[in-house]
Amino acid sequence: MNIPLPRRSEAVRTAGAALVAVALAASTAPAASAANTPRDTSRQVQYVDCGTASGKENGSRSRPWRTLDQVNRLELKTGSSILLKRGSRCTGTLAPDGSGREGKPMVIGAYGQGAKPVIDGAGNAETLLLKNTQWVEASNLEITNSGNPGRNKRGVRVQLQDFGTGTHYRLTGLDVHDILGDDTKGTEGSAGILFSVTGSTVPTRFDDVVVSGNTVRTVDREGIYFASTWNNRPVHGDFDPNGPAYVPSTRIVVRGNTLADLGGDGIVITATDGTLVEHNRLDGFQRRSAGYNAGMWPWNADNTVFQYNEVSGGETTRDGMAYDVDEGTFGTVFQYNVSHDNAGGFFLVCTATGKLGNAVIRYNISRNDHFRGIETCRGSFDDVRFHNNTIYAGEGVSQTVVNENTTEKHEIAFDNNIVVKEGSGTASFNLKSGGVTLSHNNLVNTVGTPANPGGTTADPLLSDPTGAVPLGLRLRSGSPALRSGTPVPGSPDRDLYGNPVGNPPNMGAYQGPGTV
């Protein structure tokens, strides 16, 4: 994924210029009227029922607000709750003016019985917009925006603009669907859920974010995306020495989300440090975008861990693979993930015109991924370890197990892996740089196989390779891969299945004893 994020072309503004801009904005702002005067905000809980008849609304449960605009005009008390009635449908943009504090977050959720309340963006650019706020939690809402298809738009946008550090964000139990946006990405791109840092005058970042238990389906372009204008450092090709500095967001967790039918990428992490992406399910991506998109990947981010995710249904070979270690990333770990039935393959490792390093891809499963196992792109890199993975290519599947596009040096240590090709089609290696080394791999029916000291070409006796994933990719008793690997420094103590890793380890992702 070397599509650049939006580049900042302006230098940091001076304080004087900022004051001029504020004065100009004030001089051009419309005069207040009775229609947009903030309402009484003495109550802590604001109730909303867009299906109720008009009357003397005051935000109480008996006289709830009936439009989102009424809520947007409120100056909310710190730690207020905005509760939408279950079974109701509100049209427009919800953009509350409020925030929470430690121990008293602002809550946006539902009340009553029945289906989740619906916010329909009706073709607006934003559906739920949380801007320059913190200590906020949103849950149990249905969010859709199919109007004006092809327009730039988002389902949920959490935005910090020249804010500093914003703390504590929780998005849980949201059903985001039919966000029919355009084909853009980045800080102003179209997405189901977008965390967006913008501006160039105040160093700004997110801290303590959890995005969990949401569904994101039928969205153009991005599923869940983190982007920032504060992303400048000389490790990616879009570095602007006059732009905002590098200010990574921290303590980000993306967990247990279900994504499907995405025009472009699934989950993309940029300008963060220490993000955890786990237990997410993605089925169907790169379906409508003209760009290059993959399932889950980091860009210009450090120490990102992707684990226990499952990705399938990637379309096209632009990029169309499940996972990607992209440029400007260091300390990336992909472990305990499953990939299957992706047209573009299993993995991309791509530095383009930037740098990457210290990446580990281990204890993952790939079944019937087409086109390539590992793909590299232009640009060189070092210190990438691909070990203890199991790749199975069945009937009708052809794959280049490692495909180097150029002769630029790509240092990949390919150790303790199992690669099995069965049925029609081929599995081959296309090595050009001299940087890929193999050791202790179990390679069956591969073509153009390089030297593989300590390895074997015997049948690894996979338990049921066409059955359930990942259970079918275990090893049967008598497998030549059992305890035939070589120890890898820094390995975890358990495998994808929860088995302890022995010494020596098995080849492949499964580290338990032979199954019957």
Regions found by a protein language model. Give the residues of each.
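Extracellular beta-strand/beta-solenoid scaffold signature
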Residues: 121-129, 149-162, 184-202, 206, ...
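Predominantly extracellular beta-rich ligand-binding scaffolds that present long acidic/polar faces
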Residues: 92-97, 333-339, 351-472
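Surface beta-loop-beta hairpin patches that serve as ligand-binding interfaces in beta-rich domains
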Residues: 470-472, 479-516
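Right-handed parallel beta-helix/beta-spiral solenoid domain characteristic of secreted/periplasmic
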Residues: 54, 65, 83-86, 92, ...
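Consensus "Asn ladder" position of solenoid repeat domains
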Residues: 141, 174, 209, 214, ...
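Acidic Gly/Asp/Thr-rich repetitive segments characteristic of extracellular carbohydrate-active
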Residues: 50-85, 89, 127, 497, ...
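Parallel beta-helix/beta-solenoid
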Residues: 104, 109, 127-179, 207-218, ...
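Secretory targeting and sorting signals
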Residues: 1-35
